[in-house]
Design a protein with these regions (language model features):
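GIY-YIG nuclease catalytic motif and its immediate N-terminal context
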Residues: 1-68, 72
Length: 73
C-alpha cells in the first residue's frame, strides 16, 4: 500500500508539503525530526490528508498531479 499525503506545518499553517510513502507514521516522524531537507525549516508537521493506493504507479501519478501547477494542495 502506498500513501500520498499532505502535511501542514503547525507553526506556519499556510505551509503545505506533498509526498508519498509506504509507512506514513515513520515518514511523519522523519519530517518532524528534521531528517527531510525540504520540511525541516517548518516543523513540526501534522498530517492534513492522506490517500491510500494499492497501485504504486497511480500513487506516483497522483502525487505528481498535486505537485504541478494544475493542482493546489
Amino acid at each position: 500500500m502506498r500513501y500520498v499525503y499532505i502535511l501542514q506545518s503547525i507553526g506556519d499553517p499556510d505551509r503545505y508539503y506533498v509526498g508519498q510513502t509506504e509507512d506514513l507514521k515513520a515518514r511523519l516522524q522523519r519530517h518532524n525530526a528534521g531528517e527531510v531537507t525540504h520540511t525541516s525549516k517548518y516543523r513540526p508537521w501534522r498530517v492534513n490528508t492522506y490517500i491510500a493506493f494499492s497501485d504504486e504507479e497511480k500513487a506516483f501519478d497522483f502525487e505528481r498531479y498535486l505537485k504541478t501547477a494544475s493542482a493546489t494542495a
